[in-house]
Each structure stands twice: as C-alpha cells, then as structure tokens.
Amino acid sequence: MHSLRIRRVPLSKMDKHTIAAYFQGLQDRICAGISATDGGASFKEDQWQRPEGGGGRSRVLAKGAILEKAGVNFSAVEGPLHPKMVTSLNVTEEVEFFATGISIVMHPENPWVPIIHMN
C-alpha cells in the first residue's frame, strides 16, 4: 500500500498559481502511486491549452496488470465570466473566474471490481 503525502500550504500564501502547482504535484503523486501499484503500465501525458486561458495535463494508463484504463487529469482554466453568469450573479463589473482540480477515472481489468470516478 502506498501513502499519499499531503503538503500543507499556509492560507496567506494561497493564490491561483500556488493552488494550481499544488494540484499538479498531487497529480504527479497519484499517477506514481497508481503506476507502482498496477506494475504493468505507465501513464502517457498530453498537455493542452485553452485559448480563453489556462490549460492542463491529461494522463492515461492503458492495458495495465490491474487496470484496463485509468485517467488522471489536471486542469486550471480562467477567463471572463460568460454574460449569462454575470447576469445570474448580479455583478456590475467585469469578473474573471479561475477553476482548477483533478479528475480521476479508473476501469479495472476485473469486471467484478467497480469503476472509480472522482473529482
């Protein structure tokens, strides 16, 4: 069993770059743990950019010893709020958004083991 080390960041030092870097590091640690546990395959990475702002890293493991397929994806996107959201939120000035996180999906080889999906 592999343990996941949590790195604590003081709230006073949190900004969007610090938070995104934390999630990228978490993605690295999760992928390393899954690869080590599976033992039969490694992740392939695809980096992408969002024209409106931000981007991410998609990582896929296929045909492993335990997992048929697994994806661990990181994204950090930003930009101006859509006009409908501006109206819905009842804001008068131009507002930007920032969203980041990790999405994980795993499909085991064994059909009796449940699929895993989490964000």
Residue ranges and their predicted role:
Residues 74-119:
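Aromatic- and glycine-enriched beta-alpha-beta binding-site module
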Residues 1-13:
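N-terminal amphipathic/basic-hydrophobic helices that include classical n-h-c signal peptides
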Residues 15-90:
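Gly/Pro-rich turn-and-neighbor structural signature
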Residues 7-10, 32, 112:
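Intrinsically disordered, low-complexity segments enriched in polar/charged small residues
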